């Protein structure tokens, strides 16, 4: 069976980047519209520019996917409808979507748009993929934390799968980041991430960008990915330059073509091209191919590393003699690096071959010394070549017939689409008759068009003797054929990719709405120690929700019987397919003791469990259509999204589904799949069997460690143990406390949710009693410790 080569999907932050991607060999591009895209700082496209982009891409048989992948506020649904209508009118092929409400609107109102589930939906297993299909999605962009095994399991469900192969990686588990939002009001879920994960932190003697990941590069692993059933290979970079897009696209195009031909070999020259155009401390193979800890994180640099160029040999005044290990070109951007200092420079002078010595003029403030390293940040020759990309000529064939007394006819075909045009009636020559050579000379003039006659045999001309063919008529005939083929080729390609339409929510996942245990008088408490359950119930909790710190079959078999009958279980936001299957078997075995489960990812709404399901914060029901989708999937309630203000939340009322408002608790700002302590120790293997946290000599074994930012805010880290290793939660520096806004909660008609993480047993019971009293109408004193209102009053961009 021949190998089905995956699609190469490349970024287009603006028109120049789009043309670079198309011209360099992309099979598809993804880009942002003027609103509701997750890269608000990119140039993006308005309706007119998007329509032109779609025409250009479709002419070259390149698909266009538009990101509509932010979370949408209740008051923005009318603007969303208008934007989706404009996008659909351009003929774009698909919308990449995170928000369940956006998906519902596309499904109902704009069925010509295919739906792709954004990586922010955190689909990472087969159950999530099946749920996505039931919601009308034809493709899922897998969570970046997926293993190759998980990717294969998802592909086996029949849905198209897309994985990232190159570019920047988010530190946080997909769809689970509030760090930028809570730190400065710029929400990554709204396309305005300020990248606080690239900033410096301190932890237990370590200092630096402890959360900053290397860039992903799976160039050498393309054969494995192609054999896995993955349908699309995605390059990150809508904020990158057109030159970056051209270089990365062309490298991956050549490599994929080699895979298709069966002669792929890892090419160090191509890899060096990728390193030169951009890298952060080298590359990582990412979670999908098993990279761990120090192979993921680059704790030294967050900006472009460049490539080593050479060392300073001698310094005289403002001139440095530089021995170069690579060829140096006029206009190269360089960086002189010493201990704790660096200076950006630009080389101006003759090209120097590898092994030669260059004279480098220094900036007045540059303190150069012999032995200092010099890196090249930008290769002027590479950039010049990248800018020289041109559209790929589309091979065509022509057949012309010029018969006396008959209209001129010309057929132009690209092998799939053919057009035939006619011209004026052919007259008898009054002087010199026209020849086949004359006709060929005019018809062959395809310069300035997308088409090319690659061989002379592709132009067949039949000319009667004694006729006259005006040059103007031949040119007009050719132009007419070209214009019609452009139009027909574009329309045929666009229609070939359109979905047949979206069905209503699949009956396999549409469930009857159960009687809900959630109401305005509910006091729900999330806790992690089974021994505290009875005390929390006595303190006034009406719904107990256990969030295990160890989520393994063995631990669940031990802990679930210790819970009071009717307690709920909070599922972790992320589980591998193998862990989920094993743990669900234990949950089903104890289902008679449990009151229900709290789902913390969209995919978990599709799990087959004989229990009520409550949609937690990990299932962002952020607008009325999103809440309605959650309701249709059988959830008995949901937790209000923490980024909306009270006035924005009022757009959900009257609530179509019972809701809880988190009135106390530290927000989970990030979920990490790497461990800073293991990074500090230089560990790259053994995450599954790691025992550092059980070593009494370890600081993190005695108490939850903390990350401290440059402003002195301390962010606690908590661990959840899985068979494959730990997942760390980065918690807010301050707990959210909405006791002073209880009138708002009552106006919404929502119950209370307390989420305990680092609080002591005594603090948990005390806080539960406080909120139970508040729920009964008793006055409540302010907290005796520092808290925050979160986004309840200030909102997010």
Feature locations, PLM:
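Conserved nucleotide-cofactor-binding alpha/beta core module
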Residues: 126-127
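Glycine-rich, highly charged phosphate/nucleotide-binding loops
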Residues: 45-50
């Amino acid at each position: 069976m021949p190998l089905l080569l995956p699609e190469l999907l490349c970024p287009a932050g603006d028109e120049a980047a789009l043309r670079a991607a198309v011209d360099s060999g992309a099979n598809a591009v993804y880009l942002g519209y003027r609103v509701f895209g997750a890269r608000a700082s990119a140039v993006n496209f308005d309706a007119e520019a998007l329509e032109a982009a779609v025409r250009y891409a479709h002419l070259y048989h390149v698909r266009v996917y538009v990101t509509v992948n932010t979370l949408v506020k209740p008051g923005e649904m009318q603007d969303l409808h208008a934007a989706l209508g404009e996008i659909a009118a351009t003929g774009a092929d698909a919308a990449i979507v995170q928000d369940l409400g956006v998906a519902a609107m596309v499904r109902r109102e704009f069925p010509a748009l295919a739906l792709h589930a954004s990586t922010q939906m955190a689909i990472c297993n087969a159950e999530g993929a099946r749920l996505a299909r039931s919601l009308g999605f034809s493709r899922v962009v897998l969570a970046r934390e997926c293993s190759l095994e998980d990717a294969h399991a998802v592909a086996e469900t029949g849905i198209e799968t897309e994985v990232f192969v190159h570019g920047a990686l988010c530190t946080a588990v997909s769809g689970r980041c509030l760090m930028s939002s809570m730190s400065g009001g710029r929400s990554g879920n709204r396309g305005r991430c300020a990248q606080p994960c690239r900033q410096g932190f301190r932890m237990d003697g370590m200092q630096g960008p402890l959360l900053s990941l290397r860039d992903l590069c799976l160039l050498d692993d393309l054969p494995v990915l192609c054999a896995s059933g993955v349908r699309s290979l995605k390059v990150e970079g809508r904020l990158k330059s057109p030159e970056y897009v051209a270089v990365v696209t062309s490298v991956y195009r050549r490599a994929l073509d080699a895979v298709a031909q069966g002669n792929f070999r890892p090419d160090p020259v191509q890899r060096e091209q990728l390193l030169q155009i951009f890298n952060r401390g080298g590359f990582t193979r990412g979670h999908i191919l098993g990279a761990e800890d120090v192979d993921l994180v680059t704790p030294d640099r967050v900006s472009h590393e460049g490539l080593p160029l050479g060392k300073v040999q001698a310094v005289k005044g403002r001139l440095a003699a530089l021995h170069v290990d690579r060829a140096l070109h006029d206009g190269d951007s360089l960086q002189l690096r010493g201990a704790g200092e660096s200076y950006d420079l630009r080389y101006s002078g003759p090209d120097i071959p590898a092994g030669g010595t260059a004279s480098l003029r220094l900036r007045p403030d540059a303190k150069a010394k012999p032995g200092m390293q010099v890196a090249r940040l930008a290769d002027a020759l590479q950039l010049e070549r990248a800018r020289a990309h041109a559209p790929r000529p589309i091979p065509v064939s022509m057949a012309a017939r010029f018969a006396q007394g008959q209209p001129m006819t010309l057929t132009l075909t690209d092998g799939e689409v053919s057009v035939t045009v006619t011209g004026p009636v052919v007259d008898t020559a009054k002087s010199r008759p026209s020849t086949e050579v004359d006709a060929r000379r005019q018809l062959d003039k395809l310069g300035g068009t997308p088409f090319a006659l690659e061989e002379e045999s592709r132009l067949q001309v039949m000319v009667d003797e004694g006729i006259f063919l005006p040059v103007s008529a031949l040119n007009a005939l050719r132009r007419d054929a070209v214009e019609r083929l452009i139009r027909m080729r574009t329309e045929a390609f666009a229609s070939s990719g359109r979905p047949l339409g979206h069905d209503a929510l699949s009956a396999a996942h549409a469930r009857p709405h159960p009687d809900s245990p959630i109401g305005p008088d509910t006091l729900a408490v999330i806790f992690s120690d089974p021994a505290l359950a009875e005390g929390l119930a006595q303190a006034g909790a009406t719904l107990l929700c256990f969030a295990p710190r160890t989520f393994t079959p063995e631990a669940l078999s031990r802990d679930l019987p210790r819970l009071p009958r009717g307690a709920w279980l909070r599922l972790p936001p992320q589980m591998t397919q193998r862990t989920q299957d094993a743990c669900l078997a234990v949950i089903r075995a104890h289902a008679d003791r449990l009151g229900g489960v709290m789902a913390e990812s969209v995919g978990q709404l599709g799990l087959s469990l004989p229990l009520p399901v409550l949609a937690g914060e990990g299932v962002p029901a952020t607008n009325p259509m999103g809440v309605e989708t959650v309701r249709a999937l059988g959830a008995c309630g949901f937790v209000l999204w923490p980024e909306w203000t009270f006035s924005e939340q009022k757009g959900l009322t009257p609530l179509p589904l019972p809701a809880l408002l988190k009135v106390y608790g530290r927000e989970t700002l990030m979920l990490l799949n790497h461990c800073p302590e293991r990074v500090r120790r230089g560990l790259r293997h053994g995450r599954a069997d790691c025992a550092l946290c059980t070593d009494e000599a370890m600081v993190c074994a005695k108490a939850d460690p903390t990350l401290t930012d440059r402003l002195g805010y301390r962010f606690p880290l908590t661990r959840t143990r899985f068979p494959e290793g730990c997942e760390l939660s980065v918690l807010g520096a301050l707990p959210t406390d909405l006791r002073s806004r209880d009138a708002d909660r009552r106006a919404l008609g929502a119950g209370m949710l307390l989420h305990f993480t680092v609080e002591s047993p005594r603090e948990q019971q005390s806080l539960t009693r406080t909120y139970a009293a508040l729920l009964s109408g008793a006055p409540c004193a302010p907290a005796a410790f520092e808290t925050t209102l979160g986004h309840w009053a200030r909102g997010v961009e």
